[in-house]
Curated annotation (Swiss-Prot):
Keywords: Amino-acid biosynthesis, ATP-binding, Cytoplasm, Glycosyltransferase, Histidine biosynthesis, Magnesium, Metal-binding, Nucleotide-binding, Transferase. It catalyses: 1-(5-phospho-beta-D-ribosyl)-ATP + diphosphate = 5-phospho-alpha-D-ribose 1-diphosphate + ATP. The keyword DNA repair does not apply. Pathway: Amino-acid biosynthesis; L-histidine biosynthesis; L-histidine from 5-phospho-alpha-D-ribose 1-diphosphate: step 1/9. Its main location: cytoplasm. One of its GO terms (biological process) is L-histidine biosynthetic process. The lineage of its organism: Bacteria, Pseudomonadati, Pseudomonadota, Alphaproteobacteria, Hyphomicrobiales. It comes from Nitrobacter winogradskyi (strain ATCC 25391 / DSM 10237 / CIP 104748 / NCIMB 11846 / Nb-255). This is ATP phosphoribosyltransferase. The gene is hisG. It is found in: Cytoplasm. The keyword Ligase does not apply.
Length: 325
C-alpha cells in the first residue's frame, strides 16, 4: 500500500487564504471534495496527497512528531516549539507571506535603554533595587531564553502570556515583553518600542519538511512533483520572456546582453535566422529592448511566464539532502 503524502495547511484566516493562493500560483489547486467545513482535502491535480487543515501551532507540533510530511507554518512557531529544530525539520522554502518579527520591546519611558547591553544593566539594577528579577511577558519562552542568554542577560524571569502580551507592562504584570509584530503599531499604541538590536527573529510562513515522517518512495515522488511545481513558479516569477529576430543577433551580442542586463538564454541561440528567446529580470526589460533595437531589432516582444521547469529541482534536492543526513 502506497503511503500518501500529508501536507498540513493552516485551517483558517489569512494564512489559509495565502497558502491556498500560493499553491494555486504553482498550479496546485487545494480542494475540499466533502465540503468547506471538512478538515481534510486534496490537491486536484495530484493523487496520493492528503491535505490536513490544522492551526499553525498544531502544524509545527505535527511536523515534529512526523504525522505530516510537509507543512505550512511560521518559522517563529518552528523555532519556539521544536527542540533542535534544524535536526528534526527542514525549512524548504519561504512563501512570502505571514511576515512578522519576534522582538524585545520596552516601555518608551526607558529613554536610556536602547540595546540589549543597556537592558542587562537595567536588569541588574532592577534586581538590586527591588530585590526581585525584572519580569518579561511572552509566549516565546524558548526564543526569549536563547536570545537573552546570547546577550548575557540573566537577571529576569519569564511571565508566560496567553493573551494580549503588549498590555502586560501597562497593567503591571511585567516590566517588558517579547512578542511578535508586523508593523509595530500595536506596540507603539501600548507605549512600547523595540530595542535597536532587539529583533530576535524575522519570521514568515515556510514550507517545512519533517524528518520523522514516513518517507516512502511514493511520498518522495509526490513531494518531488509538488516541489517541482513550486520551483518552476518561483523561477518564472524572476523573469519575463523576451523574443526577437534580426540579422545582427549573434553570440557576442547575447554575451553583452547577459553581462549588462542579467539575461539568460534558456534555449541557446541565436538561430541561423537570428531568432532568440531571452529571459530577463522585470526591472531591466526596457533597457534590454532598447539595446536590442539599437543593434537592429525591429520588433521585441515581451511576455509573462507562468512556469519555467528546469532539469534541476533545487527544492527537492534540499529535501533529499536533509533526509539523507
Amino acid at each position: 500500500m502506497t503511503t500518501s503524502l500529508v501536507l498540513a495547511v493552516p485551517s483558517k484566516g489569512r494564512l489559509q487564504e495565502n497558502a491556498e493562493a500560493f499553491f494555486a500560483r504553482a498550479g496546485l489547486t487545494l480542494a475540499k471534495p466533502r465540503g468547506v467545513r471538512d478538515y481534510r482535502g486534496t490537491i486536484a491535480e495530484l493523487d496520493n496527497v492528503e491535505i490536513a487543515y490544522l492551526s499553525a501551532s498544531e502544524i509545527a507540533s505535527q511536523l515534529a512528531r512526523g504525522t505530516v510530511h510537509l507543512g505550512v507554518t511560521g518559522e517563529d512557531l518552528i523555532r519556539e516549539s521544536i527542540v533542535d529544530a534544524d535536526k528534526r525539520v527542514a525549512l524548504i522554502t519561504s512563501l512570502g507571506f505571514g511576515n512578522a518579527n519576534v522582538v524585545v520591546a520596552v516601555p518608551q519611558s526607558w529613554i536610556d535603554v536602547r540595546t540589549m547591553a543597556d537592558l542587562d544593566d537595567v536588569a541588574t539594577g532592577f534586581r538590586a533595587q527591588h530585590n526581585r528579577r525584572m519580569r518579561v511577558a511572552t509566549k516565546y519562552i524558548n526564543l526569549t531564553r536563547a536570545f537573552f542568554a546570547s546577550h548575557g542577560v540573566v537577571d529576569y524571569r519569564i511571565v508566560e502570556s496567553a493573551g494580549a502580551t503588549e498590555g502586560a507592562p501597562a497593567v503591571g504584570t511585567a516590566e517588558m515583553i517579547v512578542d511578535i509584530t508586523t508593523t509595530g503599531a500595536t506596540l507603539t499604541a501600548n507605549g512600547l518600542r523595540v530595542l535597536d538590536d532587539g529583533v530576535i527573529l524575522r519570521s514568515q510562513a515556510n514550507l517545512v519538511a519533517s524528518r520523522e515522517a514516513d518517507w516512502s518512495n511514493g511520498a518522495r515522488e509526490t513531494a518531488r512533483v509538488i516541489l517541482d511545481h513550486i520551483a518552476a513558479r518561483a523561477r518564472a516569477s524572476k523573469y519575463r520572456e523576451v523574443r526577437t529576430r534580426f540579422p545582427g543577433c549573434d553570440a557576442a551580442l547575447l554575451k553583452e546582453a547577459h553581462d549588462r542586463f542579467g539575461v539568460v538564454s534558456p534555449f541557446g541561440g541565436p538561430t541561423s535566422s537570428g531568432m532568440v528567446t531571452l529571459h530577463c529580470p522585470p526591472d531591466r526589460l526596457y533597457a534590454l529592448a532598447s539595446f536590442l533595437r539599437l543593434h537592429g531589432a525591429d520588433t521585441v516582444s515581451i511576455a509573462s511566464l507562468d512556469y519555467v521547469f528546469d532539469r534541476d529541482n533545487p527544492l527537492f534536492e534540499k529535501l533529499e539532502v536533509f533526509l539523507r543526513t
